[in-house]
């Protein structure tokens, strides 16, 4: 029997008798431990060897033996809990302790920096699992950040200034408006040991051609070793940025044959995935990374869905509750929470209904009906970006006739959506409109794969905003169902750098097709001993650039 199992059995005995000396029989103990009398005798012998208890057996049927506890079950439980924390056994820890609030406090006490067996380890607490890390699929904000730590593209977009930097390719050039050439570094290795081949790049990029942003790619070839040619059907000045976006990360060509690649992907990036399940994502520094090796050896993201709302909303948590003064950085997101109105719906296809809804559902009205707690994290949005004021306050007109019920759809594991939908329900009920709530998974939401009148969502844009704002929305299939116009002409202007993003955004907002609600405050909490931490527009930071100062002696 494993030590862990023996510990659990002892704790069960200690709890049954409250740690007090007692006279009992093997049969009674067998019933407590749900095993045979013979096995109980073996267990008691093992527990005596550990020094946890004393068992003085009395011979004869009906005789009661003396059980004396020499060690506290609480102390053993705490010892076991610490062992599970060291092993990142969060699921077993919840089973052992039985109290999720107590587990939460244990986890919080272990957040931040740890130094074990010569390795620097960073522990982060998060409120939901990160189960899809496959580039080119529907990725939420935190998954997007993790993919950037695991994979590389031909180019890299600097998170701080939006400038384009070398990555897998060290140089690139436009041979012609329809022909780009990228020169790749040699001796790049994937996490599973194989060297990067040109066919990996070719298969990674050609798999994206069905997606709107990449549909103008006609061919990807390698004329000579370490050279990649990308041929286009239309000019694209943003192509080098596009090939540095998270969708265009390079995968091993055999990725579809790898077991559970979405959860356990294989890239060439500074971190490789060691473990990814419901309660933990663990990544470790890749020693054969072609760039500067990461300074933090391991990043452990502990998942505890039962986190308090405060912890969910406050952002990335790298410290315990009692060190709230250690806010490293905060910023208003480049993006917003928004409503989209589905053109497939007879109701929201009606411009009068859309206009009335936008008049009713204002950011100020939502905040006034919401719990005061949210005012700390929500800032009224009048455009897609905080600096834009495209949504003018208007007088609420008479409700259109026949409007009695609407359906709102949003994706799961986003508690702020629950709060917003409750507020929307109140606002609409006051006007005699019943709001039906439909919760789907993120992929369904992303694809617009449901019948709905309105869709609640959020978008985080990154630098350069002239690139990411249009790219993020254009690659969202749901948006195509919520516009009364095609974007083909707009994408041509955007690729030629002639689309004015402020004007384009204002058009969507003023036509009541895209309705901004809030900008969210992103906050990063951690220890001041952390260095190299710069919060990006996704609310995270580049793990490979962070490091710890040595503790003071």
Swiss-Prot record:
HTH marR-type domain sequence ranges: 1-117
Using the record for this protein, list the coiled-coil segments as residue ranges, or answer none: none
What's in the keyword line of the UniProt record?
Activator, DNA-binding, Repressor, Transcription, Transcription regulation
| Top-rank taxon | Bacteria
Gene Ontology MF: a single term: DNA binding
DNA-binding region as annotated in the record = 26-49
Task: Output the PANTHER family linked to this UniProt entry.
Answer: HTH-TYPE TRANSCRIPTIONAL REGULATOR SGRR, PERIPLASMIC BINDING COMPONENT OF ABC TRANSPORTER
Among NCBIfam families, the record links this protein to: PRK13626.1
Q: Which HAMAP family match?
A: HTH_type_SgrR (MF_01449)
Protein's name according to its UniProt entry: HTH-type transcriptional regulator SgrR
Encoding gene (name): sgrR
